[in-house]
């Protein structure tokens, strides 16, 4: 059996120590840092979504189909500082308006699913975004169909560009 030199031993030891600092422990991983969880309070499933978001320490904001007050009293000022992660469980009409406003601020629709099941809602709240293609509902079918969505900063957007733009 060949002996290991001190030099090789030290290099391997230092390499292992350096690698361990690059890999965060499982307990250090955080849930998705959503700025707000938007929900349409007219629907029971959306209210349940708000309860789940609150349990995960995500601030919630209720709407009743119209996003005007939310935009002018909250999101407009926040988006001037830079794009943020936003999650919602609303009608497709509400998503349509928020998506257009968010696009102008360097954000994009990252996830969108119509009438998701409870497991999918919990997964997205915990930060698990499926890699399937984003399909924006073009024309609303049933007005009571709810859409679970995530708006996120686009790859090209930076907080400096948004603040100066």
Residue ranges and their predicted role:
Residues 1-17:
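N-terminal secretory signal peptides and thylakoid transit peptides that target proteins
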Residues 20-24:
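N-terminal low-complexity, intrinsically disordered segments
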Residues 27-165:
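Extracytoplasmic/lumenal soluble domains of exported proteins with redox or metal-associated functions
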């Amino acid at each position: 059996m060949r002996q290991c030199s001190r030099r090789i031993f030290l290099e391997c030891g230092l390499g292992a120590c350096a690698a361990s600092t690059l890999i965060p422990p499982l307990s250090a991983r955080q849930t998705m840092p959503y700025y707000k969880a938007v929900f349409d309070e007219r629907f029971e499933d959306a209210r349940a979504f708000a309860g789940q978001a609150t349990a995960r320490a995500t601030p919630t904001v209720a709407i009743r189909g119209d996003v005007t007050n939310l935009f002018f009293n909250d999101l407009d000022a926040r988006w001037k500082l830079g794009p943020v992660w936003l999650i919602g469980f609303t009608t497709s009409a509400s998503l349509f308006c928020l998506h257009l406003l968010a696009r102008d601020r360097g954000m994009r629709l990252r996830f969108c699913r119509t009438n998701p099941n409870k497991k999918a809602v919990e997964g997205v709240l915990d930060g698990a975004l499926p890699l399937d293609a984003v399909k924006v509902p073009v024309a609303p079918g049933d007005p009571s169909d709810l859409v679970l969505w995530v708006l996120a900063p686009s790859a090209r957007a930076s907080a400096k560009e948004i603040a100066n733009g």
